[in-house]
C-alpha cells in the first residue's frame, strides 16, 4: 500500500489528483499576427469579366440568330465569325466570374488571388 500524501500546511491527507504549475504563456507572440486579413477583392477585374461575359453572350445570341436565318438571309459567311468571336469573348469572362463567385462563397480551392489584377 502506497502512503498517501499529506498537505504540509494543514497536515491533512490530499486527494490523488496531481497538480502541476502552468507554464508561462507569454512567449512574445500575439494572436493578431496569426489572423488572416480579409482578401483583397479585384473589383476592376471582376467588372471586366462581367463585360466580357455580357458581350460574349450577346455575340453568341446574334451569331446563332444569323446562322438560323432569323435576322437576315446572309447565311454562314456572316454568322460563323460572329459566333467564333462571341465564344472567344465569352469563355474568359465566364471563367473569371465563376472563380469570383466561388471565392465569394468560400469554396475550398478558390480565391480572389486566382483572378488576374491590374496591379493598381
UniProtKB/Swiss-Prot annotation:
Record bears the keyword Phosphoprotein: yes
Tissue specificity annotation: Widely expressed, including dopaminergic neurons in the substantia nigra.
Taxonomy, superkingdom: Eukaryota
GO terms, biological process: axonal transport; synaptic vesicle transport
Keyword tags: Cytoplasmic vesicle, Endosome, Golgi apparatus, Membrane, Phosphoprotein, Synapse, Transmembrane, Transmembrane helix
Free-text function comment from the UniProt entry: Involved in trafficking and recycling of synaptic vesicles.
PANTHER family: C20ORF30 PROTEIN, TRANSMEMBRANE PROTEIN 230
Protein family: Belongs to the TMEM134/TMEM230 family.
The protein's name in its UniProt record: Transmembrane protein 230
Recorded name of the encoding gene: Tmem230
Amino acid at each position: 500500500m502506497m502512503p498517501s500524501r499529506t498537505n504540509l500546511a494543514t497536515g491533512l491527507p490530499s486527494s490523488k489528483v496531481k497538480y502541476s504549475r502552468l507554464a508561462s504563456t507569454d512567449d512574445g507572440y500575439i494572436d493578431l499576427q496569426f489572423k488572416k486579413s480579409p482578401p483583397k477583392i479585384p473589383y476592376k477585374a471582376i467588372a471586366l469579366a462581367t463585360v466580357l461575359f455580357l458581350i460574349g453572350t450577346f455575340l453568341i445570341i446574334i451569331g446563332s440568330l444569323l446562322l438560323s436565318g432569323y435576322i437576315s438571309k446572309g447565311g454562314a459567311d456572316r454568322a460563323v465569325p460572329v459566333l467564333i468571336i462571341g465564344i472567344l469573348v465569352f469563355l474568359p469572362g465566364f471563367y473569371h466570374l465563376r472563380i469570383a463567385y466561388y471565392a465569394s462563397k468560400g469554396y475550398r480551392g478558390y480565391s480572389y488571388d486566382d483572378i488576374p489584377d491590374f496591379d493598381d
